[in-house]
UniProtKB/Swiss-Prot annotation:
Effect of residue 488 to A: Loss of endonucleolytic activity
Annotated ANK repeat ranges: 39-71, 75-104, 108-137
GO-annotated cellular components: cytoplasm; cytosol; nucleoplasm
UniProt feature, compositional bias: Polar residues: 283-294
GO biological process assignments: DNA damage response; double-strand break repair via homologous recombination; negative regulation of mitotic recombination; nucleic acid metabolic process; protein export from nucleus; regulation of lymphoid progenitor cell differentiation; regulation of myeloid progenitor cell differentiation; resolution of meiotic recombination intermediates
Protein's name in the database: Ankyrin repeat and LEM domain-containing protein 1
Coiled coil: none
Tissue: Expression is predominant in adult bone marrow.
GO molecular function, one term: DNA endonuclease activity
Notes on the domains: The LEM domain is required for GIY-YIG domain-mediated DNA cleavage and induction of DNA damage response.
Gene designation: ANKLE1
Quaternary structure, from the entry: Interacts (via LEM domain) with BANF1; the interaction may favor BANF1 dimerization.
Amino acid sequence: MCSEARLARRLRDALREEEPWAVEELLRCGADPNLVLEDGAAAVHLAAGARHPRGLRCLGALLRQGGDPNARSVEALTPLHVAAAWGCRRGLELLLSQGADPALRDQDGLRPLDLALQQGHLECARVLQDLDTRTRTRTRIGAETQEPEPAPGTPGLSGPTDETLDSIALQKQPCRGDNRDIGLEADPGPPSLPVPLETVDKHGSSASPPGHWDYSSDASFVTAVEVSGAEDPASDTPPWAGSLPPTRQGLLHVVHANQRVPRSQGTEAELNARLQALTLTPPNAAGFQSSPSSMPLLDRSPAHSPPRTPTPGASDCHCLWEHQTSIDSDMATLWLTEDEASSTGGREPVGPCRHLPVSTVSDLELLKGLRALGENPHPITPFTRQLYHQQLEEAQIAPGPEFSGHSLELAAALRTGCIPDVQADEDALAQQFEQPDPARRWREGVVKSSFTYLLLDPRETQDLPARAFSLTPAERLQTFIRAIFYVGKGTRARPYVHLWEALGHHGRSRKQPHQACPKVRQILDIWASGCGVVSLHCFQHVVAVEAYTREACIVEALGIQTLTNQKQGHCYGVVAGWPPARRRRLGVHLLHRALLVFLAEGERQLHPQDIQARG
């Protein structure tokens, strides 16, 4: 098991780096893409967040070699949930093409469509909604017509001719001259006749030798081509690219060919084991236009090498040879982005393929940016840098600036008013400390004299309990969250320690308060405005470690940047081993319970004269 976990961790490292050759090598070594690790997720869940072509190739490699598109994490999330929540439309389409079930729900009862809508990823939501609509339409039409299904050996492309190709996924194909593998696959279902890619030269003539292909269909299909460039490569082409064949350095474009679909000689069973039929939309009268939901791929084979007929043992020919490098792997497969395909109309060549620009943000700036958004990132390494940079970019462009700094879980609750149903998690937290083991040395002992408290700014609440009836649940929660400026753990012996500290600064000259901590300065500012501080006590009569754990979950949900707390809290017991997302959901749940306490008790302000100074 230790060896399996180690391989799975290495596989996830390769996925973070988006290195397809390393992913394939680890899969051949036996790495399990569906193995859930200690953080609650498997490699296939991490790969589902792919956005760039290299990441999509990694996801395709996992799905080809045993990756389950419906694998569950400890939170019952599937890869489709991950892709929908992160707004990764291409990864979502690829998973759907491999049999991902959009009807599965996570532990909160949410479908991928629900997550896409909550996070504002409209393209992903549209794909899932269209899929649901088409599925219901086909089911209704099928029930009305009762047409017989075509025989498995019927020539032609599979699926109805008017069905749009929503995704194209990588599928293993027989080796080419460079000992690499690539292919295409589409809608899941019984495979039909294989449709190998045909390589053409820059004049459009077929490079296949006469008699090598058996023509079996007149259907139109889209061919992805590499066109050898006659001009000198661009100045930013890497120097090592000159050693590649001319077709590797050429321009790329997608053409529409009204020609026959070739079928390689050999047994149909061998070919069907490696390729699945493509489901394509026939071109309209105005000519072919690339669909915004399709992903153009290219043939990696040399310009004059037709796909070979597979031979026994061909499944082993995709291994990484010793003389091949990752650089060759990167250049061997070139992709068109959606923007390039749409700007050229799918007909004209585009400029030379360029690598994605390397981020100029330093590690320190990246850490500061994530912490400013309420995140608590681990140390940045070459494996985590790209993931954190993507997370920072998405958070910066996410809608709802009034929720910036809060966790994604709390931001979703603030937008919708829906609170995660994690009462079972709170019960598990409380159960462990109901009768704590006296043999263990718990922090501050096992006396049940602690509680969690929130300091609120009444200038934000505006007597929220009195006017709550006129607000929606989301508005009540938003007002409550905006008012919180400190979360702490208190005891009955020291219930107002921070207010006492602020009282010591009260009345001094204005030159001195800046020496106080941010929390005290906030209290002094509230008092200076003529208001009092609201100290909300909740979750009382618990041992210290339980109060610390509740405090930590709440701080994680709120985001420390939105508070005057100077450090993150500490979790104890079973909660310490939970994934951060699970702790944040519990924090949102606890905040909602604290809101209910506040609404029930009413707003009580504490002014300087209300605090008894210590002797």
